[in-house]
């Protein structure tokens, strides 16, 4: 999406007060069952990190983090996190987790360069989770099994809400459809990556698109991915069709994390081999951090989806352009 959409005739089924109650209902139920099914413990997480640590998520490599100096630390500069993709792997070691165990956090981030629309905001809130796996488990089956587990929790949450709210009907299919970006390119060669996502999501209802970041047959990647956390051969997005807006809606991005080989190859491909000298990257290369799988699940995204809202601003507090605020008001959307 490149601009906000205000569906004709849309009216929220819940007022502002009831929306707040419903948001808590969604979050409490989902995170409880996610933690149980993936064997995750909740931990405290940082809002900011030091740039020189290499722990921040560089996203596509062009987004600017919000930075500030710290007065009583000789004006040392810190930056607000974009996500905790790399920090979590470091934390699993520091906190003494074992193979088969994992952690999750309530992650808040500011992405100042985000192009905002119905599903994108400069404020990002997600469950960031990470789990230790063995070297032998770094394979496609582990990825798919974990995707199925996350998807099962999504379906269970939708069923729970459909019982509590009469207006919510179950729309998620029984199974999620798996496809790689290369297969998707073969299926829809004349379409853009976003168009491919839309058509496959609308056809299947729920889709797991795998292997994101590397170049496809046309010489371009399906989508941008930082080279230093996901293994581009072993990652995935969970995308569902969202009829309220007639869009493909990404609910989660996840993947098996880079090992030494994947990290060095991807840093080279991304044109930033110098990052290998950063502390986190050295730890991956030296294998002093565990092998892991992890991801992020958008809290506002799933609240928007399950509560059938037309704009993410209906379920989170953020700042929006004046024209969006004006159009929302005219359309009867109540942005928080």
Each model region followed by its residue ranges:
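Extracellular structured ligand-interaction cores
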Residues: 101-103, 124-128, 204-206, 246-248
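Extended, charged alpha-beta segments that form solvent-exposed binding/catalytic grooves
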Residues: 105-195
């Amino acid at each position: 999406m490149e601009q906000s959409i205000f569906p004709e005739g849309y009216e929220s089924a819940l007022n502002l007060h009831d929306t707040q109650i419903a948001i808590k209902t969604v979050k409490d139920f989902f995170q409880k069952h996610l933690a149980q099914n993936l064997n995750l413990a909740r931990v405290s997480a940082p809002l900011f990190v030091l740039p020189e640590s290499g722990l921040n998520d560089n996203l596509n490599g062009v987004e600017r983090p919000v930075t500030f100096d710290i007065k009583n630390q000789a004006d040392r500069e810190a930056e607000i996190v974009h996500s905790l993709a790399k920090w979590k792997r470091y934390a699993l070691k520091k906190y003494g987790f074992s193979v088969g165990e994992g952690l999750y956090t309530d992650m808040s981030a500011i992405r100042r360069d985000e192009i905002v629309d119905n599903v994108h905001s400069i404020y990002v809130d997600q469950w960031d989770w990470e789990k230790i796996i063995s070297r032998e488990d770094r394979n496609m089956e582990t990825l798919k099994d974990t995707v199925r587990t996350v998807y099962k929790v999504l379906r269970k949450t939708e069923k729970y809400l459909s019982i509590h709210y009469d207006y919510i009907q179950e729309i998620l299919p029984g199974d999620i459809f798996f496809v790689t970006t290369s297969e998707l390119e073969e299926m829809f060669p004349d379409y853009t990556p976003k168009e491919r996502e839309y058509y496959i999501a609308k056809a299947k209802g729920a889709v797991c698109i795998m292997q994101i970041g590397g170049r496809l047959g046309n010489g371009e990647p399906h989508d941008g991915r930082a080279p230093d956390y996901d293994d581009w051969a072993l990652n995935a997005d969970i995308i569902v069709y969202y009829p309220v807006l007639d869009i493909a809606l990404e609910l989660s991005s996840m993947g098996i994390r880079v090992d030494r080989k994947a990290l060095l190859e991807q840093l080279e491909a991304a044109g930033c081999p110098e990052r290998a000298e950063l502390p986190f990257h050295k730890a991956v290369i030296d294998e002093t951090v565990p092998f892991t799988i992890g991801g992020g699940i958008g809290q506002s995204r799933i609240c928007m989806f399950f509560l059938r809202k037309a704009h993410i601003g209906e379920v989170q507090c953020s700042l929006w352009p004046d024209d969006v605020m004006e159009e929302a008001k005219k359309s009867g959307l109540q942005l928080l």
